[in-house]
């Protein structure tokens, strides 16, 4: 089980790493890692909403929680209990990151522009603060 504190720390570290990749012109990698920032923030928020001390990690821990075993940001937002708030108050940021999925790792380098990567990382940073303060 990953504790809420560990989830928050992981999101923070991924955001720092994504910003570093962005500064180094590694735009595709920045977005790929930036998506995990949002995923972790959503999972921490979900734990808070459900009053869980942590989020399942192993197959055994997920045994009774298969619907929570996802990287789909839309699903995680719905499960987090703050979908209406996020989509109402942060629609631009949400639309910017909502397309993300781990399959982006297969994109060819150079697919993402600097401007798009910067917008994504900025949106991920805002959502991390909102979801997991």
Enumerate the predicted regions with their spans:
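Terminal alpha-helical segments
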Residues: 1-133
